[in-house]
Amino acid sequence: VTVRIGAEEEFHVVDVESGRLVPRAGTLLDGLGEPGFGRELQQTAVESNSRVHDTLEGLFADLSATRRRLDAAAARLGLAVVAAGTVPLASVTSRAVTADTRFRRMADDYRRVADEQLICSAQIHVDVPDRDSAVRAMCLVSPWLPPLLALTASSPFWLGADTGYASWRTMLWQRWPTAGPAGCYGSAADYDAAMAELIDSGVISDTGMLYHDVRPSAHQCTLELRICDACPRTETVVLVAGLFRALVRDALGRLERGAEPGCDGHHEWLRAAAWRAARSGIEGRLVDPATRRGAPAPVVLRGMLRRLRPALEASGDFTAVRTLLDEALAAGSAARRLRRAAREENLLAVTDLLAAETRGERLAPRAAHRRRRPARAPGAGRAARAHVHSASAPGTPG
């Protein structure tokens, strides 16, 4: 049985000259004039929605073509689009919220949390037979989501400083009241009742604000992965899509066979596991879901690959996913590449590298870092030329 997949990607909008985040998403979308793109809470980001695909190859081609269209439209405006959890050169303001009634209400309700929503993620949708299956599968896949976050970690910088984290986006995201691990529910009715209670509490206003790491889609018969940073390289999105499809296929198979759930419903450790993944990405240790103990990231991820091999083979994905995982572990995380660019050049070089990878370029370590700006007025672009301030531990954002 074919289990179809799709992806949503969010992109930062940056000024090519300064490398800074700019609130020009509306202008970019107006210039595109195409379906499949949308606005986000902040005017500094746009979203794309893929078509539904049977194969990872089809998903890769779709995402790559979408990125090329976005890049071309942005270039005509002196802009670039960047797929990453954060961009290094940004300023927090309350004036960049998208002109939309719902978004304005969110900005009023959540204030600084909404103002600092200068982050982007990638979301993966996997087909499920029905909503009950989606809800029951959530419990089984949840322990394996932090390793997927580690693979996508691409946000070490925040407001011009190195946070010490591989995914600072995760730290920002977890401040929303419903962000974090999903609970375990016996049926869609149980889940829907619990979510209705959250809405009735007044803390959130609608189902669109259910920001758990994984959730059943409100509009499609899919299970949606939401824990990941946006990924500079399309290959990373495809790798995660392949692994998540296998997780869902494996969970559905176990439910159909009446196998004992692989999750006891106690998810307290999962928040700690997500923190560990956000802190060090694939360069450090992760919490191994099989043992709930720390282990080197490559060990955890290769163990995950072995565990999911039958499900990967059922989708025809095993060889591709194994190759992509080997390449990801050899290349290191996006966070590692970005820190190297900052160390060798500056934060503008980081933005240049992100934009190049987003459009599909795979450059030698310093090839994206050679751009020099013409002389400008005193003080202009100072932040763009400044070298990064390093921090081995997180500071207070903003």
Describe each PLM feature range.
Residues 16, 79, 84-89, 122, ...:
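An acidic- and aromatic-residue-enriched active-site/binding cleft used to recognize and process polar
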